[in-house]
Amino acid sequence: MQFGIVAAIADGGRTARAGGSVRPPRRPPASHTAWGLPRGRPTGQPHATPTKSGPTSIAYVEVNNDQLANVGRYQLANGANAFDVAIIFAANINWNGSKAVLYNNENVQATLDDAATQIRPLQAKGIKVSLSILGNHQGAGIANFPTQAAAEDFAAQVSATVSKYGLDGVDLDDEYSDYGTNGTPQPNQQSIGWLISALRADVPGKLISFYDIGPASSALSSSSSTIGSKLDYAWNPYYGTYSAPSIPGLDKSRLSAAAVDVQNTPQSTAVSLAQRTKADGYGVFMTYNLPDGDVSPYVSSMTKVLYGQAATYH
């Protein structure tokens, strides 16, 4: 992603990262389901879907450009879902002059409003749906809440949205905040921990994932394992690369060292990242930018390695 809501209105929320690197997503906690998913059941009434053995697959979707529902069209040979978690990219953290406020651009809002066709069908298949949140060039972000109360206020806004639209979780991304803009404070070491703790209290049983980048990443890397253990997943944020996050309280079963941009990472690189994920025993495999339409040859190149099965598009 490489823009906040200002850019998000035109761009949808997440593009290539600054400095030429293309950015990826985040991470997990407690008991896991048959798909390797953490605690809590998907919202809705999923059908009895065939299971698979292997890493939990993440699919970020730029809803400014593509349909979230497309995630559910990929199936393995035995009928299992190719992807386990679909992430709406992305809502924003705006600044209203006195505090951080959650903002959805028109495309994110349309996806939420059209839950009957964009979200519920995925959940009925056992695919969890999360909302990603990142900065919007207004000075507010997940790393600079000045007090615990401020973090709790924002967490309550997020929790209300998760509840209202029947979502399965939230994804945190420390990009495009432009800390200091509009007189906002600089990042601090406590902010991200306050937010994660407040979210875990507000949305028990829901997913909380972390796109491992920015000042929040630095703070988490030196934080108590008590904070990290409240996350469900974390992942490498640089597409086409392989590097696991280092967050106390999160073991490799809840991490993705791989980061794949489906529209930009060469297929051979995606295959190599899948092979390394399996060989090293990481429990999560993160992808970003799944487009509309059928890209099953690309998806299959990864699922054959991760699950020993090709993926088809239905």
Curated annotation (Swiss-Prot):
Site annotation (Important for substrate specificity): which residues?
174
**CDD domains, A to Z:** GH18_EndoS-like (cd06542)
Please report the organism this UniProt entry assigns to the protein.
Flavobacterium sp. (strain SK1022)
Q: How does activity depend on pH?
A: Optimum pH is 5.0-9.0.
The UniProt function text for this chain reads: Cleaves asparagine-linked oligomannose and hybrid, but not complex, oligosaccharides from glycoproteins.
> Which reaction equations make up its catalytic activity?
an N(4)-(oligosaccharide-(1->3)-[oligosaccharide-(1->6)]-beta-D-Man-(1->4)-beta-D-GlcNAc-(1->4)-alpha-D-GlcNAc)-L-asparaginyl-[protein] + H2O = an oligosaccharide-(1->3)-[oligosaccharide-(1->6)]-beta-D-Man-(1->4)-D-GlcNAc + N(4)-(N-acetyl-beta-D-glucosaminyl)-L-asparaginyl-[protein]
- Name the chain's protein: Endo-beta-N-acetylglucosaminidase
Enzyme Commission number, as recorded: 3.2.1.96
Reported impact of residue 169 to L: Reduced catalytic activity
Recall the GO molecular function terms of this protein's record.
mannosyl-glycoprotein endo-beta-N-acetylglucosaminidase activity
Per the record, the GO terms for biological process are: carbohydrate metabolic process
